[in-house]
Amino acid sequence: MKKIIYLLITTLFITACSNDDEGDSLIRRTIMIYFSAENNLSSYASEDINEIIVGSRSLAADCNLIVFVDLKSTKPYIMSVTNGETKVLKTYGSDFYASSPDNMLEILQYMVSQCPAREYATIFWGHGTGSIITNDTVANTSASLKAYGADTGSDTSSGSEKWINTTTLARVMSQLPHQQFIMFDACCMQTVETAYELRNTTDYLIAPLCETPSFGGNYATLVPILGHTDIASLPREIIDDYTGSNNKWSSVAKYFSNVCISAVKTSQLDALAAATYTALRSLYAGNKLRLSTNPAAASADDPTSCIYYFKTRGLRAGYPILYDMKDVMRNNLSAEAYQAWLPYLERAVIYKSRPDDIRTTGVCDWFGGDDPNVFGYPLPMFSSANFRSFLLSDDTYGGLAMIVPQDIYSTNTEPDMLQAMFDYQWTSTVGWNSWGW
C-alpha cells in the first residue's frame, strides 16, 4: 500500500479528541466528516466547514467531531472541532487522491484512533452518483459513469478526476468500527445497490436519491442534531433539518425547495432482497426479464416514465438508469404481488422526503430547471418538460433508487453497466442473473 507522506504540524496525543475530565472513559459518539472537495465544490466546502465550526458550539459535550478536509487551495488536513474551536491534528505534505481506498482507509483509521468512542457515525461530503461503477475509479470518457468522491489529486478544480466505487467504499468501511449511521451529502447516493453493499457497516444509511445543491446541508443547525442520543429518531431529525426551512437552497435557487432524500434501516435489506427476488420471479417468463419503465399515458399530462434520478451520461443527458424502486415495481407487478412486496420496502425505508410534483406547483420544484440564471446554465434533466415525464406522489415515490437492466446500457455506459452491476451483491441476490441478464 502506498503510504501517504505527511507533515505533523502539532503535537499529537493518543486520544486527541478526548475530554480530559473523562479520564479513561470513552466519549459517547465520534462524528467523522469526510470532505472530498479537491474539485469544483471546493468553495462550497469551505462555507460548510465554517458552518460546522458554528454548529459545534451546540454539539453535545459527550461527542467528538473530527473532520478531514481536502480542498483545491490547501494541502489535505485533519482537524478536531470543539465548542467553536478547531485544532489541526495532521497536515499532509503533499496532495493525493482522497478517493483512493488506501488513502481513505488510512485517514479514517487515523480519525478513529485519535477520537475513540463507544459509537461512530460518518458523513461523506462531495460528488456522488450512487451505484454507478467506474474502471479502477477513473472516468476518462464522456460515457463514463462514476460513484463517490471525485478528486483531482492536486490543488486544482479541474483535471483528471478519480472516484471510488461504492463496492470499494464498503470494503473500506468494513475495516472500521461499526457505524450508527453513514450519511452522504452527495448526489444520488441512496440506491438499493449501495445500501445493500454497506448494510453490514452501518445501522442506517441517509442519502439523497437525486442531484443536490453544491452548497450542501446547513451544518450550523445539522451538527448539533448529529449528537442527539435517540438513534431511532435521529435519521428523521437529520432529514427534516436537511430539507427544512432553514436550508440555504431556496434563497439561491428560487424554484428549489426540497430534494428526494431518505433513511434506510440496513437490518431490513436482506428481507427486502428476498421479497424482491420473489416478486421478480413472478414476472419471469423466459429469455430476459424486461421491466417496463414507461407507464401508459392516458392524457398529455400523464407521466410517460417511472421516476428516475440519473442518466447514462450523467445527470443531464443520456438514458435514465437509476429509477425509483417503488415506482418500477408498482408499474410491473400485479396488484396482489405489489401489495405483498411493498411492506418490505416500507420497513427498509424508514423515512423519506420529496418535493411537490410539478403538476401541483406549476414550476420545476426539484432544482433550477428552465431558468439559466439560477446557476448560470439551464439544467435540461430538471426542465419542466423532463419533470413532467414522471409523477412524484406518495403512491409513486419510495425513497430508494435501483438499476433497471436495459440493453441500451451496453452501448451507452463505460464500463458496460449490464456487466458492472454484477459487482454488487444486490444484483445476484435478487436474481438478475437468473432472469436472463
Please place each PLM-identified region on the residue numbering.
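Terminal, contiguous helix-loop blocks that mediate binding/assembly
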Residues: 24, 137-437
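Loop/turn elements at helix/coil->beta-strand transitions in domains of secreted/extracellular proteins
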Residues: 27-30, 60-65, 115-121, 176-181, ...
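A short beta-strand-loop element at or near the start of a globular domain
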Residues: 32, 48, 103-104
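Short hydrophobic segments within beta-strands
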Residues: 32-34, 125, 403-405
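N-terminal carbohydrate-binding/catalytic regions of secreted carbohydrate-active enzymes
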Residues: 41-73
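Catalytic-core segments of thiol-dependent peptidases
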Residues: 69-85, 92, 96-177, 186-188, ...
